[in-house]
């Protein structure tokens, strides 16, 4: 398959990913097919975001690493010493993707390290390995292009997380601002009583202790529930089961208390 055709396959992977959750496993599989090597997409902290195996490496430590989806801390840290593509590293390199305890089995094993960079920062590393054949210039062009595509997707995922975070916070702030003073007071007491993200409470007991009517508590809970911040379920005589759905809610409530 010609270089141009392989580049188009990577392009189509990028186009297919538009607007969908990032799937690093599919990306790794595509790169495996066009570069014909084992592919590992590793985050800054060594988390294995995606991988695809072209040539099996029989080793218990490697198997566990793939199951845990985590590269060793020391190895991950060392990857930051590789600022640009470093190709065809042998089994004796500290960056080898082969298990050094089986050095004799993988004497011809070659590793290529490609930094994943986006927005001017190091986002992770693309690691490629082969049992023997050298990585040529075409392979390196595809690997670097693949790393660029992966970097774009990591940035997109980050942007979506930031957006979701901002949306969650805005929903909570709107829900809290819709509460009257007595309703807000009731909510503060309810979540002091719960002491966590979910639990059971008896509204009448809180109402009596704080000196507010039960209807104030019910109204406050309804407002938060309609905003999607909590869910509540009546368990009859036992009380009301409450669960926080928006993880920004308790933080915002705590912030209000400290002001």
UniProtKB/Swiss-Prot annotation:
It is found in: Cytoplasm. Changing residue 207 to D: Does not bind the ilvB and dpp promoters. GO terms for cellular component: cytoplasm; protein-DNA complex. The keyword Methyltransferase does not apply. GTP binds at residues 51, 69. Residues 203-222 bind DNA. Changing residue 215 to T/A: Slightly reduced affinity for ilvB and dpp promoters. One of its GO terms (molecular function) is DNA-binding transcription repressor activity. Changing residue 207 to V: Strong defect in ability to interact with the ilvB and dpp promoters. One of its GO terms (biological process) is regulation of DNA-templated transcription. This is Global transcriptional regulator CodY. It comes from Bacillus subtilis (strain 168).
């Amino acid at each position: 398959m010609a270089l141009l055709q392989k580049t188009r396959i990577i392009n189509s992977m990028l186009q297919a990913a538009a607007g969908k959750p990032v799937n690093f496993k599919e990306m790794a599989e595509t790169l495996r097919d066009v570069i014909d090597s084992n592919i590992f997409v590793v985050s800054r902290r060594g988390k294995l975001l995606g991988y695809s195996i072209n040539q099996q490496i029989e080793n218990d430590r490697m198997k566990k690493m793939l199951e845990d989806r985590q590269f060793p801390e020391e190895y991950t840290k060392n990857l930051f010493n590789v600022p640009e593509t470093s190709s065809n590293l042998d089994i004796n390199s500290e960056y080898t993707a082969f298990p050094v305890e089986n050095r004799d089995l993988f004497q011809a094993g070659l590793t290529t390290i490609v930094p994943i960079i986006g927005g001017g920062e190091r986002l992770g590393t693309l690691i490629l390995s082969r049992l023997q054949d050298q990585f040529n210039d075409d392979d390196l062009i595809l690997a670097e292009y693949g790393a660029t595509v992966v970097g774009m997707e990591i940035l997109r995922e980050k942007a979506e997380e930031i957006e979701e975070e901002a949306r969650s916070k805005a929903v909570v702030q709107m829900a809290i601002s819709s509460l009257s003073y007595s309703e807000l007071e009731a909510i503060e007491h309810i979540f002091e009583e719960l002491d966590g993200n979910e639990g059971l409470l008896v509204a009448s007991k809180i109402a009596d202790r704080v000196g507010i009517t039960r209807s104030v508590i019910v109204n406050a809970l309804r407002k938060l529930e309609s905003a999607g911040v909590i869910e509540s379920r009546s368990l009859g005589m036992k009380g009301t089961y409450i669960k926080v759905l928006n993880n920004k809610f308790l933080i915002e409530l705590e912030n209000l208390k400290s002001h």
